[in-house]
Amino acid sequence: MINEIKKDAKERMTKSVESLAHNFGRIRTGQAHPSILEGVMVPYYGADTPIKQVANITVKDARTLQVVAFERNMLGAVDKAIGSAGLNLNPTNLGELLLISMPALTEETRRGFTKQARDVAEDARVAVRNIRRDANSSLKDLVKEKEISEDEERRAAGEIDDLTKKFVAEIDAKLAEKEKDLMAV
């Protein structure tokens, strides 16, 4: 019972950290990276479709993305979708492909992205702490049902606390790395 609760908590905390990394990937650092366009939806036969399903996105160089639509006639729609996605990106249409130059980040935008990164990290910390609370609640329920002793509950709660501290430290390390990337000129 206790091991199942700890295993479940660890898996959920790992997913929270993976989600953090995914969300950090969407925050622009001035470097070209395909994940920047992940949230872009392209109208395709009447339905909004993720850009990855209608185009191939590659990194041409450190500050340029190259987008090639799977269907040539979709290039205009992809161009329009990227331009109107609110990412402050202006694609250059070369007929067969789009080139997207990453604009240099101003000090103000860097600070805004840093604040956004901190908010995302705080959400991940809260998620990890909520998982700890759920696990501790499950342990208390087991004590009430007399399935485990109070000593076992305290020991398991301590292990879950240690696990929580480890994952929060990992979140803090990822945040520090992202802030460093954002503030690098």
From Swiss-Prot:
What keywords is this UniProt entry annotated with?
Cytoplasm, Protein biosynthesis
For this protein, the record's Gene3D superfamilies field holds: 3.30.1360.40, Ribosome-recycling factor (1.10.132.20)
Report the transmembrane regions from the record.
Answer: none
Which is a Gene Ontology cellular component entry for this protein?
cytosol
Q: Which CDD domains match?
A: RRF
Annotated compartments: Cytoplasm
The domain of life is Bacteria
A Gene Ontology molecular function term for this protein is: ribosomal large subunit binding
* Functional description taken from the UniProt entry: Responsible for the release of ribosomes from messenger RNA at the termination of protein biosynthesis. May increase the efficiency of translation by recycling ribosomes from one round of translation to another.
Q: What family name appears in the similarity comment? A: Belongs to the RRF family.
Q: What is this protein called in UniProt?
A: Ribosome-recycling factor
Q: Which organism is it from?
A: Pseudomonas fluorescens (strain Pf0-1)
**What gene makes this protein?**
frr
